[in-house]
C-alpha cells in the first residue's frame, strides 16, 4: 500500500518555473525526446484493433494500450510495473504515457522547415542573403546552387540552371561543388560563420548611405545576433529528423460499422512516412537522378503540409475535399489551442437558466431554483448527510438526494447559507458582468435577479439567460464575498459614478411621489412630524401631491464625525415627507425636496456613498427600490392613445412650411437659385418646421392649467403619463414623443442623404403607404448596424485588452515630477467638462499655489478628493498639473500615485490592481452604444453659415492666448498671428469660454477689457484672408507688371478697379521667376523695417491675391494690403462613433492630414514642380533648412516671410497623431487622443474617466526608436521597449559610460500587442505563426509578466489576490538565491551572549 501511495505521489509533479523559453530543436534533441523510430505508415490492425509494430501507433515505442498490461498479455497488473515484455517489447506502465511519449522519423533527405522558409520575412533567405524565390527554386529542385566555388569564377550562393550547371561541369570539372534541394541549403547554412559575419556587418554599418540597404543590413545583423546569442544554429532550420506527436494527441477512434474516425495528422504523417520509405528504397537502388529528385520534392511537400498545410501551393485535402488540419492550424485562430482551450475553458459546478425579476430580494441576494441548487451543491450535501449520520456511505447519500427526501431540503438550506454564488450574463463586457450573490431558494425554474443590478449586467427580462457558478474552496468563497459581492460593486470602474441607480418603474414611482399638485386635497396643512404626515395620508386627509408644511428632524454630521439633530419647518409635499423616512441619517432633506428624476436620484446615491459609506448606501438603495415600485403601482401611470396630444398649431405650421417650399421651387424654376441651394433650403425649412411643431407639442404636453385655492388660473407641470415618463428619465425622450404626437420629420436614404419630403404624419395619426415605405429604410439600416456594431465593438475590446493586459499597479510612488496639465475643457462658448471633473481622484504633480501668491494651496502628491476639489473651485484655480500613467517612471507597471483613485472604490488604488484590463473594459463596454456610421454632411449641417464673429455668452474680461496683434487707427486690435485663441475670464479668474480667432480678426475690445454677455467682440471675413501691415508708410509695388504678373479687373457694380496677381501657372515665361510683393517705404524713400527686427517690411503676394491700393498709396498700421480669396474647405465626411475610436487607437494616418511645421523658422517658397510647391523653412539660428513638397491644391495658412513655430499647422486637415508626437511631444499627443476619444463618447452621453484612455496611450507609447546607441548594445534605428532602454541606460550611467538616446514611437494597438515582450501573449492574439517563428529564432524566453501568459500556462495571474501570491513566491526565490552568510563567532562570545540572555530572562521574572 505504501508503495502505491508513493507511486501516485510521484506522478503529480508540478515544477516551479518562472519563464518559458522557445528555440529551435537540433536533430539530436529530437532524437533524445523520441522513444523509437516510426518506420511504417500502418496504424492499427483492423481485425484485432491492436497497434501495428513500428507503425504510427506502435505500443513498443509509445507505450501500452491498456493500463499495466503488455500487448501480448503476458504481464498484467501492478506487480509487473516497469517490466519490458520480451515477447512484444512493450513496457508495463500506465496508458497515459501514450500522451507524452514521442517518436521520430529519420528523413532520407533533409527538408526545410516551412515556417522559417515562408513566414515573411523568410529567415532562411535573410540568413543566406538570397531571395525567397531563389531558395524555393533550389529546394523544389528547379535549379542548382553553388556551395563551394573552389578556384573557379563562380560565386558561393550563385544560382545555376540545369544547362548552366552542365556547362560549368564541362568547363571546370570537379573544381567546384553545386547541389540542389534542402541538402544544398543545409550546407550553405552550415558554412556561415556567425561571429565573423556579425563583426563584418557591424563594421560596415556606419559607412552605408542608402536607407534601404542600411535597413536590410540591420535586419540581417539582428537575425544573426539572435542566432548567436540564443545558441541556435542556422542549419537547424532544415529538418533531418522529424518528431512524431504522441498517439493519444492524434487519436484513432473505431466507429461502429468497421469505420474509423481519425485525426488529420495521421493522414499527414502517413504521407510523410510513405514517401520517406520510397525515397530510401530508391536511394538504395541508385535510381536515376530525376526520379530521386521528384521523390525528394514530394517528401519536402508532404512535410510542409504536415507542419503548415496550405502555406505553400494548394492545401492537401482529405477524402471530403476539406483541407487537412496541420500542426500549425492546431494552435492558431479562434478554434486553435490558445484561444479555445487555454484562455477560456468550460467549468463544472455551473448551471444556466432564464432570469426573472426579484423585486423583493435584497441587493446581495439572488433567487436560485431549488432544483438547480440541489444539483450545484451536491458534494456539499453528500458530505453533510454523511457527517450528520443520515447516510452511511456516499452511495446512500446519493440515493437520498435522488429520492429528494425531506431531510435533503433541510440540509440544502444549511449548505447554502452564506455560501455566495457567482452570476454571469454573456456577453461579459466589463468586470461587472460577473458578480456574487447569496442564494435564496425559490420554487420554479427561473433565476431571480435583483432589479438594481440589471444596469451593470445590461440585462432585461425578455428571455435573457444567466449562468451560475459555485466557488468551491474557502479562498474562492472569501474572494467572492469580499471582492465580487454586488454590494461591493456600487460604483462603476469606468467613471466612479454609482452603477446601481434605479431605472424605469422605480424612477417613475419616486418621481410621481415627489411631484406637487396645486390645490390638492389637504393643501396648506401643518404637520408636527413626518409620522403625522403618514397618518394623514393613510386616512386620506391629505393626498400624495398636496403642498404642506412639515417640521422635520435632520441629523447633521460634523467634520469630526459627531452627530447633532436639527429641527426645522419646510415647505414640501406629502410624498416628499414620506420619502424622507427612508433617507439615512446624515443626509439633508433638501436632497429629496425636489422633483426626483433619474439624474437627481443618481446624485442622491452618489452623495450618500461619499458621505455615509457603503453600508448605508446599500440599505438606502434597496429602500428606494421598494418605495419606487410601491408608488409606481399606486400611481397607475399608463400609456393610452389620448395621452399623445397633437398640438393644434401643427397643421398651420406644416401649411406655412409647404408654402415656403413652393416659393423656393418657383425661384429655382426661374433660375434664381441653384439645385443644391434649393435642396438645402427645403431641408432647412422642414427641419425648422419640425422643431417648431415639437416645441408646441412639448409645451402642450408639459403644462396644464388649473384653478388654485384662491380661484385663480395657474399653470402647473402636467400629470400626463407619457410626459411624466420622459421627464423623469424613466423611459422615452422628447424625440420619441415627437414621433408619436408631433411629426416624424425628415428621413434619410440608405446612403445617408436626406429625402427632401418629410413625413408630416405622426404615429397617432398613422402613416400612409409612401410614408411607411420611406420609414423602412432607417429601420432596416438600424438593425443591420446593430449586428455589425456588436462584432466591431467586441473586436475593439479584444485589441484593447490585449494591448493593456500586462499593466498592473506594482509600487506606491515612482517619484516622477512629470505630469499632464489639466484645464477645464471648453468648446466654443461652453465649458464641456469643468476642471473638478477632470482632476477628481488624481494626484497633484506640482504644488498648486494660491492665485497670485507664493503660498502652496495643494502640495505635490495630494490625492484630490471631493473636499480638495471644492477648495480648488473656491480659489478658482483653472489649471492643475496632475500625475498620469503616461508619464509614470515605473518599469513593467505603474505606480499608485500616477494612477490616483481607484474609481470603483473611491480611495487610492491598491497594489496588484489590473488597471490595464479595467481600462480596456471601460472603453470597450460602451462600444456597442456608439454609432457605426460616418456622418455625411448635407443640408442643414454643411451650410451652417461660415463663422465670422464671436458673440460671448458670459460676462467677464477678455484674454488672448498666444496672439500677436497691432492697433489700427480706430484703436481696435488686429490679430496678426495664427492659432490665436480668445478667452472670457469671469471675476474669479476662471475661464468660461474660448474661441479660435483667425489671422486678420478685428477685436472690438482691448485685452483685459470687460465684456457683457451677448456682445460681439470679434469680426473677420470668412471668405478672404487679409495680409495685414505691421508698419505705417507708403507702399511700393515690386515685380508687379500688368499683363505679366498681374491683371486689372473692374467690378461692374461699383466701378472700382482692383489688381489680381496671376498664379505662376498662368504667367508667361517672363513672369515665371518674378516675385510680386509690396514693400513699405518711409517719407524719405528708405525701406522700413518690421518693428523690433532687422527684417525689411515687405509682403509677398501669392497667386490670386487681390490688391485694392495703388502704387505709392499711404497706409496705416493694421490696414489690409491685399486679400486672398479662400476656397471654402471641401466638406469632409466626419468619421464618427466606433470607427473613429478604432482609428484613434490604431493611430491611423488620416487621408489628407494637416501639414505641420517640422522646425521653427521663417517660411519661403522654393522652385515649384508641375503639381507641387516647395516649402522651405529657414531656422533663425542659421541651422539646416527644411524643405517639403506640398501639392498645389492644399490650402496653405502661411505666407512667404512669415515665422512659424515647430508643430504649427501649415495646411489644414485632420492632424495625424504621429506628427503631433514627433513635433509637439508626448503631452500634446496624449491630450489630443484623450480629447478626440472623449468627444465621440460624450456625443452618446457616455462618461469615461480620462485615466482609462491614458492607460491605453501609455501602452501605445511603450516602444521607442534608438537614435544613437552610445555604449549600449542596441542598434541605431532599432525598435525597443522604453523600459528596457531606461534600465540599460541606468546601468551605463552607473558605469560612467554613454547612455543610448531614443525617440518615443506611437504604435497602434494591434501593432503594440504584437510587439509585446511576451511571445505567448502575442501568439495568442494574432499572426501566431509569425510571432512563434520570430521567437524561436531568437531563442526568446517569456518571463510570464502579463496576465495572459499566466492564464495560458495555468498559473494564478499576477494581479489582484494573485499579485500577493506571486510577490511572496518571488521574494522566497530571491532569498533562496542569496548566499547564506555564516557569522563566525568564538566560543567565548557565545558563552557571553548566553549569559546575557539568561540574566535578561531572570530580571524579567
From Swiss-Prot:
Keywords: DNA-directed RNA polymerase, Magnesium, Metal-binding, Nucleotidyltransferase, Transcription, Transferase, Zinc. Binds 1 Mg(2+) ion per subunit. Binds 2 Zn(2+) ions per subunit. Zn(2+) 1 binds at residues 70, 72, 85, 88. The keyword Transport does not apply. One of its GO terms (biological process) is DNA-templated transcription. One of its GO terms (molecular function) is zinc ion binding. InterPro entries: DNA-dir_RpoC_beta_prime, DNA-dir_RpoC_beta_prime_bact, RNA_pol_asu, RNA_pol_N, RNA_pol_Rpb1_1, RNA_pol_Rpb1_3, RNA_pol_Rpb1_3_sf, RNA_pol_Rpb1_4. Mg(2+) binds at residues 460, 462, 464. Zn(2+) 2 binds at residues 814, 888, 895, 898. Its EC number is 2.7.7.6. GO terms for cellular component: DNA-directed RNA polymerase complex. It is an enzyme of class 2 (transferase). Its cofactor is Mg(2+); Zn(2+). Signal peptide: none annotated. It catalyses: RNA(n) + a ribonucleoside 5'-triphosphate = RNA(n+1) + diphosphate. Pfam families: RNA_pol_Rpb1_1, RNA_pol_Rpb1_2, RNA_pol_Rpb1_3, RNA_pol_Rpb1_4, RNA_pol_Rpb1_5. NCBIfam families: rpoC_TIGR. The RNAP catalytic core consists of 2 alpha, 1 beta, 1 beta' and 1 omega subunit. When a sigma factor is associated with the core the holoenzyme is formed, which can initiate transcription. PANTHER family: DNA-DIRECTED RNA POLYMERASE (PTHR19376), DNA-DIRECTED RNA POLYMERASE SUBUNIT BETA (PTHR19376:SF54). Belongs to the RNA polymerase beta' chain family. DNA-dependent RNA polymerase catalyzes the transcription of DNA into RNA using the four ribonucleoside triphosphates as substrates. This is DNA-directed RNA polymerase subunit beta'. It comes from Shewanella sp. (strain MR-7).
